[in-house]
Amino acid sequence: MAEPPPSYLHFVGPAKTRSSSKRHSFSSSAHPASHRLFPCQYCPRKFYTSQALGGHQNAHKRERAAARRNLGVLANSPPILDDNNTFLRPYPCFYQNPFQGSTSGNEPLQEQPTMMTMDGYDPFHPYPYVYPFALSGNNNDGGNGVMEEDEPLDLDLSLRL
């Protein structure tokens, strides 16, 4: 069979030359002959050069530094949604969380008040001027979970020097 013209490319096997039909081994600079691999200490990746490994580990270093900064910010800020503390929840609670309430299993879970059960709820004006907040968390006052004013307070609001 005749040899293909020189412009024809062989993608399947190693390149042949006209002068000899010997196979030439490909040596790539990306894969050195020593076949030494440099493993990353933080993930399962391996690299052929120490420089590539160094750059990769610098990326891990930056990720860890950013995570430490974020943890410091979160540790110094108050908890936003902590179910163990009592906080005001201005949005209606349409379902009962099965993980809140009694852990003994003998006591029934207390139903939280919702906006749908409160008197005077208007779905077209859901934010009245005096908003009835629902309380969650430990509420030991025996109430129904709605803040109510018993009597107006006599507060002295005058400023004196």
Curated annotation (Swiss-Prot):
InterPro entries: ZFP3-like, Znf_C2H2_sf, Znf_C2H2_type. Residues 1-33, 142-161 are annotated as: Disordered. PROSITE patterns: ZINC_FINGER_C2H2_1 (PS00028), ZINC_FINGER_C2H2_2 (PS50157). One of its GO terms (molecular function) is DNA-binding transcription factor activity. It is found in: Nucleus. First expressed in developing carpel primordia, and later in stamens and ovules of flower buds. The keyword Cell inner membrane does not apply. GO terms for cellular component: nucleus. It comes from the Eukaryota. Its main location: nucleus. A zinc finger (C2H2-type) spans 38-60. A motif (EAR-like (transcriptional repression)) lies at residues 155-159. SUPFAM superfamilies: beta-beta-alpha zinc fingers (SSF57667). GO terms for biological process: cell differentiation; floral meristem determinacy; negative regulation of abscisic acid-activated signaling pathway; regulation of DNA-templated transcription; regulation of flower development. Keywords: Developmental protein, Differentiation, Flowering, Metal-binding, Nucleus, Repressor, Transcription, Transcription regulation, Zinc, Zinc-finger. May function as a transcriptional repressor of cellular proliferation that regulates floral determinacy and relative size of basal pattern elements along the proximo-distal axis of the developing gynoecium. Contains a slightly degenerated ERF-associated amphiphilic repression (EAR) motif, which may be involved in the activity of transcriptional repression. This is Zinc finger protein KNUCKLES. It comes from Arabidopsis thaliana.
